[in-house]
Amino acid sequence: MFEKSTWIRLPRNVVVGHGVLDDAVEVVRDTHLTGRPLVVTSPTPKTVAAENVVAQFEAVGDDPAVVVVEEATFNSVERVLGEAEAVDPGYLVGVGGGKAIDIAKLASDHLNVGFVSVPTAASHDGIVSGRGSVPEGDTRHSVSAAPPLAVIADTGVIADAPWELTTAGCADIISNYTAVKDWRLANRLQHVPYSEYAGALSQMTAEMLVDNAANIKPELEESAWVVVKALVSSGVAMSIADSSRPASGSEHLFSHQLDRIAPGKALHGHQVGVGSILAEYLHSGQEGQWMAVRDALASLDAPTTADELGVADDEVLAALTSAHEIRDRYTILGGGISEVAAREAASRTGVI
């Protein structure tokens, strides 16, 4: 008897384009969210976008509350929950980059209220997904949560964000290429459940960005449009799979371990981009697609070497040889690779 079932949670509204920030109230109304909004933001996004959103809610009498978080930590989540206890919000609105959106996402999931994502930078696929990433000490936790009910991505705002944040988002998407390879490998060798649809969507998104990398330029709304659509596709793939597998493989394990060994040296997206070069070499060898991955990253001004990441060669090798210890997730790294193998991969690809 067939007993398989799935529950796919997706955003109800994804609004992308020029000037859509001004439609915040209309988008929220269309999702049927009611009550007092609690806007979660951080210092720079507060000026860039959150004040606009707050003014819109004030204009219609929704009496928005605002909490400004400095960093993405569980303490920040607790702070938002404390504010929520005081104001009794009907829903949360995360305005900013990774910090504010992840904090709002986790807090709204805990409160069991709706959440609206308003990204001010295209720095990672968390703007749409049901995953939140929160560092704690030298460890970064990937936490499951409900995806946003709505996403409002203003390409004008995102195009004006620091270019390095956009290149980090691009690198995060490009790394889906090796994440899907790791997922398929885990399915073959460990019988890990695999979704053909989610895998194909994630791989197509990565390949699209690799093919168009040379056309993505700073301060162009057309470029912001392409990157945001790719981030949305990646987030949807994770929701379909009910797993981060479509967008997180050995390259993410490498990045998380690098966070422990050399904390604060580089952006997450840039680290997984370099990790993807290494992972593709490990998957396919010298004749694989690692050069295409590297060249796409380079055309975006994203790092492709340890030096460009700001980390030492030995730190890259240490992260690569111990990345399998991060979590119980089968990838091309298996139970770990030797330092000799790690050095060969990093040297052949020019990472070190």
Curated annotation (Swiss-Prot):
Annotated pathway: Membrane lipid metabolism; glycerophospholipid metabolism
Binding residues annotated for Zn(2+), in chain numbering: D172, H252, H268
GO cellular component, one term: cytoplasm
Cofactor, how bound (note): Binds 1 zinc ion per subunit.
Annotated EC: 1.1.1.261
Binding site for NAD(+): G98, K99, A100, I101, D102, T120, A121, A122, S123, S129
Keywords attached to this entry: Cytoplasm, Lipid biosynthesis, Lipid metabolism, Metal-binding, NAD, NADP, Oxidoreductase, Phospholipid biosynthesis, Phospholipid metabolism, Zinc
SUPFAM superfamilies (alphabetical): Dehydroquinate synthase-like
Residues where substrate binds: D125, D172, H256
Biological process (GO), any one: phospholipid biosynthetic process
Entry's localization field: Cytoplasm
Reactions catalysed: sn-glycerol 1-phosphate + NAD(+) = dihydroxyacetone phosphate + NADH + H(+); sn-glycerol 1-phosphate + NADP(+) = dihydroxyacetone phosphate + NADPH + H(+)
HAMAP family: G1P_dehydrogenase_A (MF_00497_A)
Record family assignment: Belongs to the glycerol-1-phosphate dehydrogenase family.
Functional description taken from the UniProt entry: Catalyzes the NAD(P)H-dependent reduction of dihydroxyacetonephosphate (DHAP or glycerone phosphate) to glycerol 1-phosphate (G1P). The G1P thus generated is used as the glycerophosphate backbone of phospholipids in the cellular membranes of Archaea.
Annotated protein name in UniProt: Glycerol-1-phosphate dehydrogenase [NAD(P)+]
